[in-house]
Amino acid sequence: MKNVCGLDVHKDSIFMCIIKENGDKIEEKFGVLTPELDRLRDLLVYHSVGDIAMESTSIYWIPIWRVLYSDFNIKLVNPYFIKQLPGRKSDVKDAHWIATVLQKELIKGSFIPEPIIQELRLYDRRIFYLNRSLQRAEQNIDLILQRCNIRLSNYVSDIGGKSMQKVIDSIIEGKTDPDILLLLVHKRTRNKHGDEVIKAALTGVISKTDRMMLKLSREETCMYERQIEECYVEMNSICQTHFSQEIELLQTIPGIKKDSAMRIVAEIGVDMKAFITASAIVGWAGLKPRNDESAGKIKGRKTLHGNKFLRVLLVQCAWAACRTKGSRFFYKYQTLTKRMNHNKALLANARKILVIIWNILSKKQPFTTTYIAA
C-alpha cells in the first residue's frame, strides 16, 4: 500500500486528508491561491504521497491539477461514483472518504488529456459556445425583420446565408426598395418561389430604430464569426505542429473535413491507450445504449450521458456522411430509417464513425472508403 491523499475541492478552499500505509491520518485545510497550492505540494512531497484523488468540481480542480500533475499520480473522479455514506457529510469527512476509496482502489480516474490537447480543447469549446451565440444573434435578426414584416426567412434555407446577409446589409444602409432587395436574393430562391412572392416577402415597414437594431445585431454576428475564425487559425497552428498526420488520417472518413478533424482531436486526443476498446470510447462519448434490465425485462435503451461536445460534433459529421451518396454511411442510414426515426439513425452512424476514428488513431492507418455504385 502507498501513502494516498484525498482532496475535497471548493471555490475558495481545499480540504486535504493523507492516509499513510500504517493507517495514520493527516488532515489540513488550504486556500486556493498559488502560494497555498505550493505549500500543499510541498506537504505531499514531504509525506511521500504517491497517489492523489479529487472530485471534478466545476473548473476549480484545474489550477490544482496544473500545480501537482508533474509530481504525483492524480485521479480526477466523477462525484457521482464516490458518493459519501448518508450521515457523514462534511468537508473533512469527504476528503477522508476520497482517500479511503483511493487506497482501496475502488475508484477509476476520468480521462484527462495531455496539456497540448487541453489547449486545443479550450479553442474547441470556445467555438462550440460561439456557434450557439451566433445562432441566437441570427435568430434575433430574423425577429427584427419579422417585426418589420420582411419574411424572406420563410423562403430561404439558412437565415445566416449570403442572400439574407446581403438583404440585411442593404436595409441597414437605408435601401429598402423591394425591387432593389429582390436583385440581392439568389436566383435559385427566386426561381423556386417566383419573383412576385419574394418581392412581397421583402416589402415591409422599416423604421430608423429598426435599422439601428439590425446594425447592432449584424455587428454582433460579425464579431462571433471573426472570433470563430481566430480560434480555428490557432487550432490549425497547433495541429500542424503536433498532429498533422492524425488530422490527415481523420479526413479520409466521409463527412469529416479539416475543421471537424481538429475538433475531434481536441476532445479525444490522439493516444487511444486511454480507451482500451472502441466500446470504451463509445460509452465515454455517450453513444452507447445503457443496460437497464430487471427480472429479465429490458426497461430502456436510452444512450448514456457523455461528452456533449464530441457527441454533437459526431452527429453533425454523421449527417454529412449520410448525404455522401455511395458511401457505406449513406446506405446504412437508408437502411436504418426504414425501421427507426431520423435521429436514431443519425446517432447509430455517429457511433459507427467514432469506432472508425478509434481504429484509425490506434493503428495509424487511413480509412478505406468503399463507394458503391448507385
Residue ranges and their predicted role:
Residues 1-374:
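A detector of single, family-specific signature residues
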